[in-house]
């Protein structure tokens, strides 16, 4: 089991992400020479990010990951993380911050007890950086594109589909987790 580093209350991001009954929020992050850093912080939600322009260094639980255009990042809940601009070129990313309760993390079913709760408790370690050479990359890109389209268009029932694409994303990442349970 991976033990995350100690969380300092002062580093907690105190922002409400989404609505009470639909706790997900989209963010576009832009880093420039004038504003090259997102400072170290943590929150109770997970993050799913696509780098849309440039390159950066993500620090997740004090481990550095170099990320560039097209890369996908997954940050589990309750992990310290920051972003630093890697070069003088501008950087942009699209991020969905979501609470695991959106996916059923607060229910007592097999998905919650076997997968979601262990993710939150860091008993399952999923890959944080997914690059083009990762076996799940193409599938994750398709899921991300569908998630983004649904979030923006908000057609009737979009909440159901967003939930399903987030669950699909976690399923794909679970295939490459460092701890697996037998079924």
Which stretches of residues belong to each language-model region?
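An amphipathic alpha-helical interaction segment
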Residues: 131-182
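Generic protein-terminus/edge-of-domain signal
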Residues: 1-68, 72, 79, 113-114, ...
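A hydrophobic/aromatic-rich effector-binding and dimerization subdomain
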Residues: 2-25, 84-148
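Short, solvent-exposed loop/turn segments at secondary-structure boundaries
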Residues: 61-62, 71, 85-87, 108, ...
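Short histidine-centered beta-strand/loop micro-motifs
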Residues: 36-42, 84-86, 106-108, 160
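Residues immediately flanking
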Residues: 53, 77, 98-100
